[in-house]
């Protein structure tokens, strides 16, 4: 089956659906790394964060695409140990889909909207307005590279994003 567009799952329409104990066959999250770069160095003077501006659900595939993009840009511009990046949300929400048969004779094999609860097809992270998604810590000379990496990550997400400076704003003025 083809994957449905993210716009089907972007809006928060109902209560959370997270209790995996009662569900069979929840697909695993594609996001496997939440901390990247120099994890031991805690003395980076500048910290930037990517905030979402609207309440929405972000699929695990979009989070992974944003993480890979930001990580690749940071490695190219700062080196493997020139930054620390953290993904701050986890895709707890289980997404369902009521699959429909199409083609000749589909009306005989499908049950339409009877028993339409749906099968588990993926996971998503529910985020609120102004919640931090990514945080990047860098040295002063790598500030522009970190900002560019977060901008590219924001382009992969289904909501408008904003970059804010958490620490070290006086160093980049």
Swiss-Prot record:
GO terms for biological process: translation. GO terms for cellular component: ribonucleoprotein complex; ribosome. PROSITE patterns: RIBOSOMAL_L10E (PS01257). CDD domains: Ribosomal_L16_L10e. The keyword Ribonucleoprotein applies. Pfam families: Ribosomal_L16 (PF00252). Keywords: Ribonucleoprotein, Ribosomal protein. It comes from the Archaea. One of its GO terms (molecular function) is structural constituent of ribosome. The keyword Ribonucleoprotein applies. Gene3D superfamilies: Ribosomal protein L10e/L16 (3.90.1170.10). Belongs to the universal ribosomal protein uL16 family. This is Large ribosomal subunit protein uL16.
């Amino acid at each position: 089956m083809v994957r449905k567009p993210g716009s089907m799952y972007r809006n928060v329409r109902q209560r959370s659906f997270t209790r995996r104990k009662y569900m069979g066959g929840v697909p695993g999250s594609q996001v496997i790394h939440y901390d990247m770069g120099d994890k031991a160095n805690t003395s980076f003077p500048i910290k930037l964060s990517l905030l979402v501006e609207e309440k929405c659900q972000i699929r695990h595939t979009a989070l992974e695409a944003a993480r890979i993009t930001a990580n690749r840009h940071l490695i190219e511009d700062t080196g493997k140990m020139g930054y620390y990046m953290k993904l701050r949300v986890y895709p707890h929400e289980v997404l369902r889909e009521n699959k429909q048969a199409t083609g000749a004779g589909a009306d005989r094999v499908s049950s339409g909207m009877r028993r339409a609860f749906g099968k588990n097809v993926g996971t998503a992270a529910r985020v609120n307005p102004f919640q931090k998604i990514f945080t990047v810590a860098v040295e002063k000379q790598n500030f522009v590279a970190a900002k560019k990496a977060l901008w590219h990550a924001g382009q992969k997400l289904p909501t408008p994003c904003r970059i804010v400076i958490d620490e070290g704003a006086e160093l980049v003025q």
